Amino acid sequence: MKIISDIQELRDHLRGQNRASFVPTMGNLHEGHLSLMRLARQHGDPVVASIFVNRLQFGPNEDFDSYPRTMQADIEKLEKEGVYILFAPTERDLYPQPQEYRIDPPQQLGDILEGEFRPGFFKGVCTVVLKLFSCVQPKVAVFGKKDYQQLMIIRQMAKQFALPVEIIPGETIRAEDGLALSSRNGYLSVEERAEAPELQRVLQQVREQVLGLKHRDVSSLLEIEKKAIATLAGRRWEPDYIAIRQQGDLAPASNEQLQAGEPLVILTAAKLGKTRLIDNLEI
């Protein structure tokens, strides 16, 4: 596996080859990331992974400085997966000048849910992803469904900018107890780790309640959301949201759409101690 930090060197290595299958990451790799590498390979070699902890998507009180950086272990994992190139730029490599141009997602998608509680987050995500796409010029790019809203936004960005890349979703990988794998799970104490699967259990309960409705309507969904939030809060979680939304655009469904069988997804974010976890479940 070649490890490259310079953009021009990356382009030189990729020139004349098939267009890559690309998996962007922030490192601290776990089985969820590695499953995305395998999915990328199914869409063709060479597979290019990137590791870059993107300052632009962290807020002033978030964990940029403490975000786990495990480069040597990550390299070993990627080598075992047969990744062709690891693109691991420094900030100076990727942002040689201040990044004054930013990609601002539309408010109806970028300022809701995660965007409401992490202002500027998706602006930072879209900016770095577009820049990485420019560097790698991939045929396909793989993003995990655990970050459901991010996947939707990147897909829409690629479509609106007519980028020649297909966005492939990767299924969420979970621990045996149901907790979605995440680099931030390492922040959890032993007691918090034992409690953390409750987040997925609550989503499963919400799903069962929605499927059990004889007639779906807006008021019924709001009541289910309210009770689920209360359930988490009663277990010492600090929920930011539990929201039942349309899969297509993450907007709340109308009564007419619900009665027509609009596909739905449940999305949540909640803090357990100092660790903020996100998860989702399609209906």
From Swiss-Prot:
The active site is at H33 (proton donor). Catalyzes the condensation of pantoate with beta-alanine in an ATP-dependent reaction via a pantoyl-adenylate intermediate. Keywords: ATP-binding, Cytoplasm, Ligase, Nucleotide-binding, Pantothenate biosynthesis. This is Pantothenate synthetase. GO terms for molecular function: ATP binding; pantoate-beta-alanine ligase activity. HAMAP family: PanC (MF_00158). Homodimer. ATP binds at residues 26-33, 144-147, 173, 181-184. InterPro entries: Cyt_trans-like (IPR004821), Pantoate_ligase (IPR003721), Pantoate_ligase_C (IPR042176), Rossmann-like_a/b/a_fold (IPR014729).
